[in-house]
A protein has these predicted regions:
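Contiguous, structured surface segment used for ligand recognition
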Residues: 1-88
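The substrate-binding groove and active-site-proximal loops of carbohydrate-active enzymes
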Residues: 42, 92-104, 157-172
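Aromatic/hydrophobic pocket-lining residues that form the small-molecule binding cavity
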Residues: 48, 107, 171, 175
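Short, solvent-exposed loop/turn and secondary-structure capping segments
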Residues: 51, 105-107, 124-126, 133-138, ...
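Aromatic- and acidic-residue-enriched carbohydrate-binding clefts of CAZyme catalytic domains
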Residues: 86, 130-184, 199-216
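Short, well-ordered coil/turn segments that N-cap beta-strands
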Residues: 88-91, 118-120, 183-187
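A conserved hydrophobic secondary-structure block that centers on an alpha-helix together
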Residues: 93-129
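Aromatic/hydrophobic pocket-lining residues that form π-stacking "cages" and hydrophobic walls in ligand
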Residues: 110, 178, 189
Length: 216
């Protein structure tokens, strides 16, 4: 995150963000670097956002450093013109948090990385045999028990999780925050609950959902 001063008239070295009907693709952009500064044009805010990502990719990596000794005081970008638009409207990544759980803080960083590479869809695999990861208030045992693996847990250790209690889940507020955070970065989240297949985490916490073999 960064803070920017918004001004009505620009001086040398400014970055100007503009909406333009001259851009054909809703996610396309034009990036112009000239002697007076940087201009980014997009047909929509999405296009402008992707133009900003390209500009960021031109900057040295130590702009992300938190140490004052590593901070960049100035950056010189050569004059250039980039007209860019996505070839594919769906640019997705799938993250399986059932088999390997990643907490909310990791998810937010992961979403930042997706935005950096202009990925616009996150397929979020929230439930499988190895863990249930989203809070359902009507069925609390899904996360009280079904979100944890280890010796003595209802789910056995798997995928290198070890014998100690391992796992976690997202509260409903966590999910809302993650979805909003992604939307602000032009990323749509597709949540996946793997049912009725791969439903061990449900079956061991609420066995009453299982079919009675004698009635089949």
């Amino acid at each position: 995150d960064a803070d920017f001063n918004i001004v009505e008239s620009a001086s040398s070295g400014f970055v100007s963000l503009n909406l333009s009907d001259d851009i054909d693709n809703d996610e396309g952009y034009r990036l112009v670097v000239g002697k007076n500064g940087v201009e980014i044009y997009g047909k929509t805010e999405k296009g402008v956002f992707y133009g900003i990502q390209t500009l960021i990719q031109m900057l040295p990596s130590n702009i992300y450093e938190k140490s004052n000794s590593s901070l960049v005081s100035s950056v010189v970008i050569p004059s250039l013109l980039i007209d860019d638009a996505p070839r594919f409207s769906y640019r997705g990544m799938m993250l399986d948090v059932s088999r390997t759980f990643f907490d909310k803080e990791y998810m937010l960083k992961f979403i930042d990385a997706l935005a950096y590479y202009k990925v616009n869809t996150l397929h979020w695999h929230l439930a499988d045999d190895q863990g249930w990861r989203v809070e359902i208030k009507k069925y609390p045992k899904l996360t009280e028990q079904g979100a944890w693996r280890g010796a003595g847990e209802v789910l056995n250790p798997a995928y290198g999780s070890g014998n100690e209690r391992n796992g976690g889940y997202y509260s409903q507020d966590d999910v809302r925050e993650i979805v909003q955070y992604a939307a602000e970065r032009n990323i749509t989240i597709i949540p996946e609950i793997d049912l009725p297949g791969h439903s061990k985490a449900v079956a061991v916490t609420y066995p009453e959902i299982l079919c009675d073999i004698n009635t089949i």
